[in-house]
Amino acid sequence: MSGARLHTLLPELTTRQPVMVVGAAVIDVIADAYALPWRGCDIELKQQSVNVGGCALNIAVALKRLGIEAGNALPLGQGVWAEIIRNRMAKEGLISLIDNAEGDNGWCLALVEPDGERTFMSFSGVENQWNREWLARLTVAPGSLLYFSGYQLASPCGELLVEWLEELQDVTPFIDFGPRIGDIPDALLARIMACRPLVSLNRQEAEIAAERFALSAEITTLGKQWQEKFAAPLIVRLDKEGAWYFSNDASGCIPAFPTQVVDTIGAGDSHAG
């Protein structure tokens, strides 16, 4: 399918299976940096904005704007950051299934270099404090597509989330590991992959995955070896070059379609959405 054809199909998307988004809503403090900080330095940043973000929230917003209904399990706390997030979600017509948790939501400092490359420094909040009581509130319908972020899977609550995933029947996990793919313990990562999730990786994450799983760094070979090893679908996002997809019965590359770049924060999340 061409990128142009895909672009024309976006307004016609409909919900074909239940969707639940499990993850984080946080505050992004975005600043321009002429260079990344080095040890002992003192550099001046130019603040762009203070935005509501988080991988799961970006996906929830993208789905809502595409007309795709989803259950959103994005823990909201009781604090300044949480209230800002709650108000933003309300403006987007979104509610969270996990609300009024004890504590505040986390925040992230995003440094944007002149070429658009992003570097993140994160401070955790209630979004990484999942517990059994929260999970018991979630009703996951059979056949659901269930999104997880690597940020939560690599956090102290990752073990609990994977246990919950293993208990569910007839669901398709969609996992965007993000940069945390290198931080998840081997044993836990093996259990995640045993659930045969649909995994989405960007260019850098694919390189990390190839090294970690002893696979080829060449994209098409990586996709083939991934199928042989995990029997699970894989998406590799190559920014302006489009995205490769691999499954047991098909593979190919979808070219990117031209668009006006507003900013690069949340680009991968929007693609997942």
Regions found by a protein language model. Name each.
Residues M1-P75, V80-I84, K91, P255, ...:
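Glycine-rich phosphate/adenosyl-contacting loop at the front of the ribokinase-like
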Residues S2-V19, E44, E211-G273:
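Conserved phosphate-binding/catalytic region of the ribokinase-like
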Residues M20, G71, Y147, T172-D176, ...:
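Structural detector of well-ordered beta-strand residues that form the stable sheet scaffold
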Residues V61, W107-L111, T119, G242-F246:
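Short beta-strand scaffold segments in enzyme catalytic cores
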Residues L63, N202, G268:
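Short, conserved phosphate/pyrophosphate- and ester-handling motifs at nucleotide-, phospho-/glycolipid
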Residues R88-N105:
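A glycine-rich helix N-cap at a beta->alpha junction
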Residues A110-P156:
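Conserved phosphate-binding/catalytic loop of the ribokinase/pfkB sugar-kinase fold
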Residues W164, Q169-F174, G178-G252:
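Conserved phosphate/ATP/ADP-binding segment of small-molecule kinases
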